[in-house]
Design a protein with these regions (language model features):
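Conserved catalytic micro-motifs used in adenylation/nucleotidyl-transfer and phosphoryl/amide-
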Residues: 1-5, 32-87, 115-141, 192-194
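ATP-dependent adenylate-handling active sites, centered on carboxylate activation for C-N bond formation
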Residues: 5-8, 44, 50-76, 133, ...
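Short, polar/flexible loop-turn hinges at active-site or ligand-entry regions and domain interfaces
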Residues: 6-15, 30-35, 88-95, 114, ...
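Adenosyl-5′-phosphate
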Residues: 8, 12, 86-93, 118-125, ...
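Short, conserved phosphate-binding/catalytic loop or strand-edge motifs used
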Residues: 19-24
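Active-site-adjacent loop/helix segments that line or gate small-molecule/cofactor pockets in enzymes
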Residues: 25, 97-113
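Active-site loops of AMP-binding adenylate-forming
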Residues: 27-29, 106-110, 250-255, 295
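Short, conserved clusters of charged catalytic residues that mark active-site
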Residues: 30-31, 38-40, 112-115, 161, ...
Length: 326
């Protein structure tokens, strides 16, 4: 979309399909902050302006792509992984950030801008930063989700609008110069993603599922049923999780603690899919967006009780939440 817009404006591209060149062109044409408002999807980038001797960095709205950095006495370092920073500067301090660890024990992850190390920061989602002469000049939020609007549409209208938005979001992510596939667990999230891809006519579509010998955790039959219904080229593999052998690799990539029990299955299915392709769509984020976890229902029950004055401490808890967000 941006490429077509730039071509109509008279820009000539040196490549046929480079997202990087499109980003640079839109950056040159609109400037940093206006450029960010045009970008859709996941990204993390850094652009060096040779004329201004300024580095411009940004991370996508939801923080899908990682961006970590360190400000040192010798300049500014950035990477997509924490291990990348330690590779750049072997003497970079590895002192733990105990406040970040405290947050991890509370929230089961370390929220940005903190990391597990005092010397390293994470650029938060929907944020950008500007570096001049090796020093951070400013960090700012360029987008925020407006939760105050109420549309007033019916449930049916909202459902149809949501369906159209899912299809459109999927269509945008099918633009790729390499073959792509999809992870399929048989659950609602990944099944909707694969159904959207199939509806858009992306064929042949390869889907990937992993299963376990323990039937309590094996979802292969559900994934197989969805794959047959949608006519995908389906691949399955039974795995025997060995946390001891893969944990060092996972820790290297994560760079910090993360109490998410889906990390291990995701690691295995990613490794499985990588044997055939390099790009795959997933259903990640569905439960978070549409309150699919039991804890969201429990919070709604707490709100119901609080509205009736049955939880005296509720007002204090709400203030604590606001304080943490600030």
């Amino acid at each position: 979309e941006l490429r077509a817009e730039l071509i109509r404006a008279g820009h000539v591209f040196r490549t046929d399909h480079s997202d990087t060149e499109v980003l640079l062109r839109i950056f040159q044409r609109l400037g940093f902050e206006t450029c960010l408002s045009k970008l859709r999807g996941m990204f993390a980038f850094a652009v060096w302006d040779t004329h201004e001797e300024t580095l411009y960095c940004a991370r996508d709205r939801l923080g899908v792509k990682p961006f970590v950095y360190a400000q040192t006495d010798r300049g500014f370092l950035f990477s997509s992984e924490i291990q990348g920073l330690f590779a750049l500067r072997t003497d970079l301090s590895r002192t733990p950030d105990y406040q970040a660890i405290d947050h991890y024990l509370t929230f089961q992850y370390i929220p940005a801008p903190m990391s597990g190390f005092k010397s390293i920061r994470k650029l938060p989602p929907a944020h950008a930063l500007v570096v001049k002469k090796g020093r951070i000049e400013r960090i700012f939020r360029y987008w925020n989700l407006d939760l105050t609007k109420r549309s007033g549409v019916s449930f049916g209208e909202a459902s149809e609008t949501l369906r159209e938005m899912v299809i459109e979001a999927t269509r945008l992510r099918l633009v790729s110069d390499v073959p792509l596939g999809a992870f399929l667990s048989g659950g609602v999230d990944s099944s909707i993603t694969v159904a959207a891809i199939a509806r858009l006519g992306a064929s042949p579509l390869e889907t990937f599922s992993i299963g376990f010998e323990d039937e309590r955790f094996n979802e292969l039959p559900f994934a197989r049923e969805v794959a047959q219904h949608l006519g995908t080229e389906h691949h399955e593999m039974i795995v025997k999780p060995d946390a001891v052998s893969v944990m060092p690799r996972m820790i290297d990539h994560l760079g910090e603690p993360l109490a998410d029990n889906s990390v291990m299955p995701t690691f295995y299915v990613s490794e499985f899919a990588r044997s055939r392709l390099t790009v795959a769509l997933t259903g990640d984020g569905g439960d978070e967006s549409f309150a699919g976890y039991r804890r969201f229902y429990q919070i709604r029950r707490l709100e119901w009780l609080a509205e009736r004055g049955l939880i005296p401490a509720w007002r204090g808890l709400r203030k604590l939440t606001v304080a943490l967000e600030d």
